[in-house]
Amino acid sequence: KLIKAVINGQVARKKIDDTALRIVRTMLAFHNARLNDGRSYNETVIGCQDHRNLALKSAQEGITLLQNTDQILPFNRSIHKKLLVLGKLGINDNIGDYGSSRVYSAYNISVMDGLQALLPNHEITYYDGTDPQFAAFLSAQADAVIFVVGFDHDDEGEYVSPNQSSCYTAARGGDRIHGLGLHPDEVRLIQIAGPVNKASAVILIGG
């Protein structure tokens, strides 16, 4: 379309040249800055222990406790030995967008993975929460319940499929049709299974 617009005189060639110049100038500036930096980085630093420690620290300091009714948290390891993890994000490698910012890490640790590694002697059950009533049944049998809800790359994207251009908010990866709140099925899961077990906590993933 752009080439056609230039040929038809709708877009001036100078505008194209000016735009290209700005891009190339910026690329060269960063390239020269890297050459003059004096430091070099190779693949050995990718996923090194220092970087893993920093990632762990960032994750820990990025967690915010929004509410702790009846001081349920922290769970007591000697009392809460039978745990239930609810929600489709409980076993997902949910580490960000799948677009240009996607990161391909050597390994990922889901909430379920982390709990199993931290509490090897505890009984930990997972259910995706598809049936809230069954989730409530499982909740009644657990010592504590952890709901893992929130957003993944399909909710945070910017891409809207052309065949859904007339309904942007419903498009996968576009604006969320239900606004900025949790998905209705996750809200229903918490409302139905949550009250069954007083020792329930919700992990909200967003960002």
Give the ranges of each region predicted by the language model.
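C-terminal non-catalytic regions of proteins with extracellular/luminal or membrane-system context
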Residues: 1-13, 45-49, 53-207
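Conserved beta-strand positions in repeat-built beta-propeller and related beta-rich domains
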Residues: 35-40, 75-76
